[in-house]
UniProtKB/Swiss-Prot annotation:
Residues 309-588, 608-936 form the ABC transporter domain. GO terms for biological process: nucleotide-excision repair; SOS response. A zinc finger (C4-type) spans 252-279, 739-765. PROSITE patterns: ABC_TRANSPORTER_1, ABC_TRANSPORTER_2. InterPro entries: AAA+_ATPase, ABC_transporter-like_ATP-bd, ABC_transporter-like_CS, ATP_grasp_subdomain_1, P-loop_NTPase, UvrA, UvrA_DNA-bd, UvrA_inter. Gene3D superfamilies: ABC transporter ATPase domain-like, ABC transporter ATPase like domain, ATP-grasp fold, A domain, P-loop containing nucleotide triphosphate hydrolases. This is UvrABC system protein A. One of its GO terms (cellular component) is excinuclease repair complex. It is found in: Cytoplasm. The UvrABC repair system catalyzes the recognition and processing of DNA lesions. UvrA is an ATPase and a DNA-binding protein. A damage recognition complex composed of 2 UvrA and 2 UvrB subunits scans DNA for abnormalities. When the presence of a lesion has been verified by UvrB, the UvrA molecules dissociate. Pfam families: UvrA_DNA-bind, UvrA_inter. GO terms for molecular function: ATP binding; ATP hydrolysis activity; DNA binding; excinuclease ABC activity; zinc ion binding.
């Protein structure tokens, strides 16, 4: 019993009463077509139950913070361990999260810098030493004669609590006053009640002195008292100046600057003791961006160059026009000159204002008057309104014209100057985290510590080294620890969490992973597989939902789920070792593994239509002044190892650059010199894996526009006409036809305190979303709720005589989505499914033959059989004269390209150049190309 996990009667989603035995402490791959039920079995059944049982064992107090898991629809699961899921969805979007903080390496670094860091003066850069009482007295005596000062002992600094004992203690030592959170209190008279959950500063007032000759003795006593009370610190409050902090520990004798005792919190950009005060520790500031305020500098002011000004402002009777008239008289320009040709001074005044008051003549209701007006400029105006408004809508509106820029104070380093002045091995903590991970490991290994520092740091260094090594082993050596977590791809984020788990060295755990090979080049795949085996060998069970052939060949056990997708899936087709799967007649996966089935090579490679889109001088992120040519009328793949610059070139520069030129979009592209050849395309479409909608109200029928036609069809029925129902009656988003008890959701959310929220079908409409009257209207015997509950395949048969609906549904069938329901909430669709719905929507439109489609790893989540289908669809788009550019690692996909742009040679700093371009055959012959090396086997 102990060596197996036994699942009996799983019925979650489309699973058909599945029973299964899988070995423990092995590497198990779940595979099958997209939508066959792999995730339902791995995540929604096995993981959900493992997690639920663990959480159930905790107290109800702890459970309210964790959220209770629902019990999955399964009869029983035996042999379960506590389960940890490592999926793609849980990347932190918090701008404060970095690779360093997510992997916890940054915590060890803070400790390292606090314990063995060498402090320097932030002003002059000299190494800082401790200050004696005499030095402190001498510096105070240099203040102007008759300066009023207060000597304070900083006892509590930024700590939560009521601190009653501390205040009592100060009183007992004979002090009558204390400064609490910046205010002076009389300890004998005032009743002081401090808020328990707020951080406080408490300083005892030791002495109040006027600086003059002869006070040195008294000053020395007061400073010694303060140093004793506040563990080596004294705070001098000078009337009309900033407080000065002196320390018998660290201070610069030349500049008179003291810094706090080194502590880990000083290096945290989330702590008030470490973060840069200007940007609040984010490293960037949102600023109004002139390129967003004036996106098209070829336009004139009258023609709409300043995008924040509507047409009404250009009417001659408007106030803005009268102000502009006064500016025109002063600077001699007109409103019809293209913005780029206006003198620099005029552009500056329009954006940042006119220092002198203008005489503005303005007529309102036949009364003309002359006003003295200060013109503040459009950028200053937006900035002021942003600071003053309390309206979230107004803020969101103005944020459209803002972009993130490095903070001018910390230059993006996020920390205070004092923290950045501390070095280990000659580098400060920001310089260290900005290096690529492989360089960081080399640097850590090369530091020469003194004997004392070696003893202090040995344990910390060991932890940092092992964690950096794990990141390198999962193929992330090109990242840096300062990289924001929100900018990572799903695959990168998942592999970081994988590295963190290996670092935790747990055993006896059930790990469930969702396609860890996503975004990984074949070259790095071997390292990933050995990492997975390492996790298994420690004594863990790994269930990996995966389509990657290499991973399957290395697995101990494979479970093939199918045979089809959706309604046609949900059964175990085959399970066993690699050989057993390959010899199983029923297994589609087995047929591809043996080579009986494969993705066929195209009969010929297209040459394109002779036109190119060329990106010149691309320099964003790690791109090294790259010039890339993309032939139009072809299927082009952009390849290269992880971190080589593919996404930067295609998404940040090509897509955003063209989007700005062709669609006048506001998104700022990355750095490049120019893009040529764009006149040969009329549309640019990015088909990504983002959800088709954020709420359960959006679904495949609404996204593809099918639902509008279906509602129209229902409103044309005899019954609907008699009742006077229009198409709006059949919408679940507006009042009229929908069930008002659940507002057309079909379910009602019941909030539970200690348990997870419960969703129950609406009692009134029984989950059908519509009221009784609406459901009485039928088309071919089915009401609108029945239609929404049909799969695409069923609906195609049902509506075969309605060409407008049939065409849209046929494209959904073509992309392999016959199994999804028309009304399936978008929140229940995977990224791959969302992407294919978008593809189907594009296929159903009339092609202009001049569209450029961009896809980023469309094979994510696709079984090799689905990849075969996808290739055919993309070829169909190109056959219509369009151009498709795909970022891809899947070699079955790459071999079908007409043209390849291969980036490399490595990731990060060692990447960012074009290694080879041309047909797959040409790439396979390129010596430098890693892609070519692996592609040879597929051609």
């Amino acid at each position: 019993m102990k060596d197996k996990i036994i699942v009996k009667g799983a019925k979650v989603h489309n699973l058909k009463n599945v029973s299964l035995e899988i070995p423990r402490d092995k590497l198990i791959v779940f595979t099958g077509l997209s939508g066959s039920g792999k995730s339902s079995l791995a995540f929604d059944t096995i993981y959900a139950e493992g997690q639920r049982r663990y959480v159930e064992s905790l107290s109800s107090y702890a459970r309210q913070f964790l959220g209770q898991m629902d019990k999955p629809d399964v009869e029983s699961i035996e042999g379960l361990s506590p389960a940890i899921s490592i999926d793609q969805k849980t990347t932190s979007r918090n701008p404060r999260s970095t690779v360093g903080t997510v992997t916890e390496i940054y915590d060890y670094l803070r400790l390292l810098y606090a314990r063995v860091g060498v402090p320097h003066c932030p002003k002059c850069g000299k190494e800082i030493t401790q200050q004696s009482v005499d030095q402190i007295v001498d510096q105070i005596m240099e203040l102007p004669e008759r300066s009023k000062i207060m000597i304070l002992a900083p006892i509590i600094r930024g700590r939560k609590g009521t601190h009653e004992k501390v205040l009592e203690n100060i009183k007992k030592q004979g002090f009558v006053r204390a400064r609490i959170d910046g205010e002076i209190y009389d300890l004998t008279e005032d009743e002081i009640k401090l808020e328990k959950n707020i951080k406080h500063n408490i300083e005892a007032v030791v002495d109040r002195i006027i600086v003059k000759d002869g006070i040195e003795g008294r000053l020395t006593d007061s400073i010694e008292t303060s140093l004793k009370m506040a563990e080596g610190l004294v705070l001098v409050n000078i009337i009309g100046e900033e407080d000065r902090l002196y320390s018998e520990h660290f201070a610069c004798a030349d500049c008179g600057i003291s810094i706090d005792e080194l502590a880990p919190r000083m290096f945290s950009f989330n702590s008030p003791f470490g973060k840069c005060e200007r940007c609040d520790g984010l490293g960037t500031l949102m600023e109004i961006d002139e390129d967003l305020v004036v996106p098209n500098k070829d336009l004139s002011i009258r023609g709409g160059a300043i995008s924040t000004w509507g047409d009404s402002r250009m009417k001659e009777e408007s106030w803005t026009y009268c102000v502009l008239k006064a500016l025109m008289e002063k600077y001699n320009f007109d409103l019809d000159t293209p913005y780029k040709d206006l003198p620099k001074k005029v552009q500056e005044v329009l954006m940042y204002g006119e220092p002198e008051k203008l005489k503005v003549t303005y007529t309102k209701e036949n009364v003309t008057a002359v006003y003295n007006h200060s013109f503040e400029g459009e950028i200053n105006n937006l900035r002021r309104r942003y600071m003053e408004t309390n309206s979230d809508t107004m803020k969101a509106e103005i944020e459209k014209y803002m972009s993130d820029n490095p903070c001018p104070k910390c230059k993006g380093a996020r920390l205070k100057p004092e923290a950045l002045a501390v070095t280990v091995g000659g580098k400060n903590i920001f310089e260290f985290t900005s290096m690529a991970i492989r360089e960081e490991l080399d640097f850590i290994n090369s530091i020469n510590f003194s004997e004392k520092d070696k003893i202090i740091s040995s344990q910390i260094i060991k932890e940092i080294q092992s964690r950096l090594s794990f990141l390198i082993n999962v193929g992330l050596d090109y990242l840096d620890l300062a990289r924001k977590a929100g900018t990572l791809s799903g695959g990168e984020a998942q592999r970081i969490r994988l590295a963190t788990q290996i670092g935790s060295q747990l055993m006896g755990v059930l790990y469930i992973l969702d396609e860890p090979s996503i975004g990984l080049h074949q070259r790095d795949n071997d390292r990933l597989i050995s990492t997975l085996k390492q996790l298994r060998d420690v004594g863990n069970t790994l269930i990996v939902v995966e389509h990657d052939e290499d991973t399957m060949r290395e697995a101990d056990y494979i479970v093939d789920i199918g045979p089809g997708a959706g309604e046609h899936g949900g059964k175990i087709v085959a399970s066993g070792t690699l050989d057993e799967i390959m010899s199983n007649e029923n297994s589609l996966t087995g047929k591809y593994l043996t080579g009986a089935k494969k993705v066929e090579l195209p009969e010929e490679r297209r040459k394109g239509n002779g036109n190119f889109i060329t990106v010149k001088g691309a320099k964003e992120n790690n791109l090294k002044n790259v010039t890339a040519k993309f032939p139009l009328g072809t299927l082009t793949m952009v390849t290269g190892v992880s971190g080589s610059g593919k996404s930067t070139l295609v998404n940040e520069i090509l897509y955003k650059g063209l989007n700005k030129i062709v669609n006048k979009a506001k998104d700022l592209p990355g750095k490049f010199k120019e893009i040529t050849g764009y006149e040969n395309i009329d549309k640019i479409i990015d088909i990504d894996q983002s959800p088709i909608g954020r709420t359960p109200r959006s679904n495949p029928a609404t996204y593809t526009g099918t639902f509008d036609i279906i509602r129209e069809l229902f409103s044309q029925t005899q019954e609907a006409k008699m009742r006077g129902y229009k198409p709006g009656r059949f919408s679940f988003n507006v009042k009229g036809g929908r069930c008002e008890a659940c507002s057309g959701d079909g379910i009602i959310k019941i909030e539970m305190q200690f348990l997870s929220d419960v969703y129950v079908p609406c009692e009134v409409c029984k989950g059908k979303r519509y009221n009784r009257e609406t459901l009485e209207v039928k088309y071919k015997g089915k009401n609108i709720a029945d239609v929404l509950n049909m799969t695409v395949e069923e609906a195609l048969e049902f509506f075969e005589n309605i060409p407008r609906i049939k065409n849209k549904l046929q494209t959904l069938m073509d992309v392999g989505l016959g199994y999804i329901r028309l009304g399936q909430p978008s929140t229940q669709l995977s990224g791959g499914e969302a992407q294919r719905i978008k593809l189907a929507y594009e296929l159903s439109k009339r092609s202009t033959g001049k569209t450029l489609y961009i896809l980023d790893e469309p094979t994510t989540g696709l079984h090799i059989h689905d990849v075969n289908r996808l290739v055919k669809i993309l070829q169909r788009l190109v056959d219509g004269g369009n151009t498709v550019i795909v970022i891809e690692h899947n070699l079955d996909m790459i071999k079908c390209a007409d043209y390849i742009v291969d980036l490399g040679p490595e990731g990060g700093d060692k990447g960012g150049t074009i290694i080879a371009t041309g047909t797959p055959e040409k790439i396979a012959g390129a010596k430098e190309s890693y892609t070519g090396k692996y592609l040879k086997k597929y051609l």
